[in-house]
Amino acid sequence: MDMTGTISAPLYLLRGLQLIGWRDMPHALDYLFADGALREGTLVAINAEKMLAVEDNPEVRALIEAAEFKYADGISVVRSLRKKYPQAQVSRVAGADLWEALMQRAGAEGTPVFLVGGKPEVLAQTESRLRQRWQVNIVGSQDGYFTPEQRQALFERIRDSGAKIVTVAMGSPRQEIFMRDCRRLYPHALYMGVGGTYDVFTGHVHRAPKFWQDLGLEWFYRLLLQPSRIKRQFRLLRYLRWHYSGKL
């Protein structure tokens, strides 16, 4: 807590990228709902794969650096932070879990929410489940199947809805581009890129069991289910080299 009484969180540098350090999920929620007022800005989950994308693509780096709240979603990133900053009290906050926690808090407080992305049927199921489970005040939605020409009208819909949380499930970097552009018209909300979270929430895609997650082996579980991911996993060897050579 800072001198004003607002919940604070330390910042850490990893390969030049500034990450926010949350101790756990309650800390993350209290930080985002500071003094009962939701912070404005963009939430971006950082894992090893995204760290590589930041290194290799200047446009992605600019997008990610511009986001106000970059947090450690991947266990590899958490371990790197703890190695570089031995006193850091930082834990993994999985993006899918943070989204659910935000939705639950939004339902309890009546915070207006706008959902973007996903297949039409998945989005409809997501809305229905959010309303049934937590009475979330969903003030608008749009599936991921819209044309570039429809973007501006969608930005205006989001602004006119008065949403205070906007979650975007379009995959990276498309969702980061969308959030950046929408915020230029309507900055008065918390934006969150959520990738495939709607699919997980509705049961169309299954996450690794908690046992695998706790061991930091969620990536291996996904590899067993999808052997075609092997090329993506080989790319992550470069991140391991940074970690073990101290080039963080």
Swiss-Prot record:
Belongs to the glycosyltransferase 26 family. Keywords: Glycosyltransferase, Transferase. It catalyses: UDP-N-acetyl-alpha-D-mannosaminouronate + N-acetyl-alpha-D-glucosaminyl-di-trans,octa-cis-undecaprenyl diphosphate = beta-D-ManNAcA-(1->4)-alpha-D-GlcNAc-di-trans,octa-cis-undecaprenyl diphosphate + UDP + H(+). This is UDP-N-acetyl-D-mannosaminuronic acid transferase. It comes from Klebsiella pneumoniae subsp. pneumoniae (strain ATCC 700721 / MGH 78578). Its EC number is 2.4.1.180. The keyword Repeat does not apply. InterPro entries: UDP-ManNAcA_Trfase_WecG (IPR023085), WecG_TagA_CpsF (IPR004629). It comes from the Bacteria. Catalyzes the synthesis of Und-PP-GlcNAc-ManNAcA (Lipid II), the second lipid-linked intermediate involved in enterobacterial common antigen (ECA) synthesis. Transmembrane segments: none annotated. GO terms for biological process: enterobacterial common antigen biosynthetic process. One of its GO terms (molecular function) is lipopolysaccharide N-acetylmannosaminouronosyltransferase activity. The keyword Membrane does not apply. The lineage of its organism: Bacteria, Pseudomonadati, Pseudomonadota, Gammaproteobacteria, Enterobacterales. Pathway: Bacterial outer membrane biogenesis; enterobacterial common antigen biosynthesis.
